[in-house]
């Protein structure tokens, strides 16, 4: 089993400029690859004797719009009490039309949608995460890896359905989770949490019909990024290291 630090250096040395970034965080190695280099790099990672990533565990879409922005102010939070200000509820998301929502989305270029691939080497017992950003935010397109790992078929369909990422070369790219005739991609940050339409059963027509949404938009769990004193690593008391319990 290769240590993550060793795997990181091997990847940097072998692939060089084909990796736009490669780093180690929390014991896991992640590599960023351009769409033009994705298939060649992935094929090498699967077939290369030093890599042998035979298994693709997962493919997931990500929408990085408003990434790193929260809805509750936590910079001045302490262990007791609250000092957080929020904007008025918007379209199912706090501040959707402000800095956390559509404005931020429209200002971003080329770094909104990505596919993240989780690879496992059964031969060498190591793992790797590969990320690839689509170059066009309006129509995100990435190469399909189904020709390398056929198991990517349904995972890519899911990313297409939920995020609208188009995988070129996919043998059957159609929706997999949403209903027939569904409009939009529900995991995108600018998709309203209450949805666009509301299904109900019409007893007169004997089928499900769609109508306007009647529920009120509200946020039950705000997006919060906590980096205050409550989440600092606990410090050991002096003189306790090495002592037996009791």
Curated annotation (Swiss-Prot):
Its main location: membrane. It catalyses: a quinone + NADH + 5 H(+)(in) = a quinol + NAD(+) + 4 H(+)(out). NDH-1 shuttles electrons from NADH, via FMN and iron-sulfur (Fe-S) centers, to quinones in the respiratory chain. The immediate electron acceptor for the enzyme in this species is believed to be ubiquinone. Couples the redox reaction to proton translocation (for every two electrons transferred, four hydrogen ions are translocated across the cytoplasmic membrane), and thus conserves the redox energy in a proton gradient. InterPro entries: NADH_DH_suC, NADH_quin_OxRdtase_su_C/D-like, NADH_UbQ_OxRdtase_30kDa_su, NADH_UbQ_OxRdtase_CS. Its EC number is 7.1.1.-. It holds the Pfam family Complex1_30kDa. One of its GO terms (molecular function) is NADH:ubiquinone reductase (non-electrogenic) activity. One of its GO terms (cellular component) is plasma membrane. Keywords: Cell inner membrane, Cell membrane, Membrane, NAD, Quinone, Translocase, Transport, Ubiquinone. It is a peripheral membrane protein. Belongs to the complex I 30 kDa subunit family. This is NADH-quinone oxidoreductase subunit C. The keyword Translocase applies. It comes from the Bacteria. It is found in: Cell inner membrane. NDH-1 is composed of 14 different subunits. Subunits NuoB, C, D, E, F, and G constitute the peripheral sector of the complex. It comes from Halorhodospira halophila (strain DSM 244 / SL1). It is an enzyme of class 7 (translocase).
């Amino acid at each position: 089993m290769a240590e993550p630090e060793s795997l990181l250096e091997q990847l940097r040395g072998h692939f060089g400029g084909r990796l736009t970034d490669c780093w180690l965080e929390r014991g896991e190695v992640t590599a960023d690859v351009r769409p033009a280099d994705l298939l060649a790099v992935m094929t090498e990672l699967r077939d290369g004797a030093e890599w042998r990533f035979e298994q693709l565990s997962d493919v997931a879409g990500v929408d990085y719009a408003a990434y790193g922005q929260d809805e509750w102010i936590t910079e001045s939070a302490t262990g007791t009490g609250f000092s957080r200000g929020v904007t008025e509820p918007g379209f199912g998301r706090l501040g959707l039309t402000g800095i956390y929502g559509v404005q931020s989305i429209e200002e971003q270029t080329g770094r909104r949608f990505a596919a993240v691939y989780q690879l496992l080497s059964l031969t060498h017992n190591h793992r790797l995460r590969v990320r690839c950003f689509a170059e066009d935010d309006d129509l995100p397109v990435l190469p399909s890896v189904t020709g390398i790992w056929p198991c990517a078929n349904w995972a890519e369909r899911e990313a297409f359905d939920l995020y609208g990422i188009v995988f070129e070369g996919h043998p059957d790219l159609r929706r997999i989770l949403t209903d027939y005739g569904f409009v939009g991609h529900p995991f995108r940050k600018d998709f309203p949490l209450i949805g666009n339409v509301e299904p109900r059963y019409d007893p007169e027509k004997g089928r499900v019909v769609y109508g306007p949404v009647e529920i009120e938009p509200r946020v039950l769990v705000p997006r919060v990024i906590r980096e205050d004193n409550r989440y600092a690593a606990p410090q050991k008391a002096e003189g306790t290291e090495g002592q037996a319990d009791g």
